[in-house]
């Protein structure tokens, strides 16, 4: 029984290490609390990306916020900044935990600092 328990612990640790190798985990703090009708966005600034590369952004719990799949970018140009809405229920105590991963031809890995240059939270005003 102890051997079986030890095996499960080892598998759990390996799975956690594999997830860390396949994604970048970030916890971002909102600049202030959301007001009525306001929306928080994750602004993802991308650098140089290889052709066919996609950036998947989810909450730490696995809820998909979006997939960034730039097309038509010339070789040597940065991919730009993309805004993904953050659901209000994903914000806990003024923070949001995100997971970013790169998908390319069926393989998943963590993005490099050159691929994802920054991720910031921006609050947009309510639409009137």
Regions found by a protein language model. Give the residues of each.
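Sec-dependent N-terminal signal peptides of Gram-negative exported proteins
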Residues: 3-19
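Beta-strand-rich recognition domains
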Residues: 19-128
């Amino acid at each position: 029984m102890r051997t079986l328990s030890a095996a499960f612990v080892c598998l759990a640790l390996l799975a956690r290490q594999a997830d860390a190798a396949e994604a970048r985990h970030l916890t971002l703090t909102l600049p202030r609390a959301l007001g009525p009708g306001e929306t928080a966005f994750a602004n993802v600034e991308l650098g140089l990306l290889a052709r066919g590369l996609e950036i998947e952004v989810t909450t730490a719990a696995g809820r998909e916020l979006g997939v960034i799949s730039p097309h038509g970018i010339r070789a040597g140009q940065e991919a730009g900044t993309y805004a993904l809405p953050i659901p209000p229920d994903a914000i806990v105590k003024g923070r949001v935990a995100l997971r970013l991963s790169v998908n390319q031809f069926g393989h998943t890995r963590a993005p490099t600092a050159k691929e994802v240059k920054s991720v910031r939270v921006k609050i947009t005003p309510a639409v009137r």
